[in-house]
Amino acid sequence: MSSRGRLSERTDGSQHGAWVGCPRDHRAGSGTLGFVKFDNEFIVRKPKSEIAEVLAADATVTQLFPDTEIVSSKGATRETKTRVSALGVESIVRFVFHTEPDGSLRFEKICDGRVWRSLDGAIRLLPVNDKLTRVVIEMEGTTKALVPEFTIRAPMQSQLSQMTRALRERLERA
């Protein structure tokens, strides 16, 4: 159970919930915008401080998605580019990742306006006790008015699952 409702258990032990279809901000454009929100979480048998170190590493950011490279880095902020295939079209997507003082990692997509008006997320680290940390991955975004939520739901769920697997493997290995 999360603070937002029941989560379903997955075969890999992670939990997942998705809330979609709610208009977030009608001021951003005409018509109802497609608001999507996804989250996933898992527990790692390491203290938060160890996980925060791994999460802050460039190698972790580049392993979240295949074909990702860091194109600029300044302090706790990194910009990446990733080659992806979404909705049948090959393209390059750019994200900005920012490491927070508490060890969390915020990210946002640099939107080109073709599909997304906004896409933001975070990887939060919540200590369960001295030896366990809950890792929560959240993404939410608003699609353009002419992009129905159902066309983006499956690719987003797939990307979140891929990101969760890669992050979990990296955190458990380190």
Each model region followed by its residue ranges:
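Intrinsic-disorder-associated, low-complexity terminal segments enriched in Asp/Asn/His/Tyr and depleted
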Residues: 12, 25-26
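Hydrophobic ligand-binding cavity/cleft-lining segments
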Residues: 29-77
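Hydrophobic/aromatic beta-strand elements that line small-molecule binding cavities or substrate pockets
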Residues: 40, 68, 92-98, 119-127
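A short, structured loop/turn motif at beta-sheet edges
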Residues: 48, 73, 98-102, 124-134
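Beta-strand/loop substructures that line and gate deep hydrophobic ligand-binding cavities in soluble
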Residues: 110-162, 169
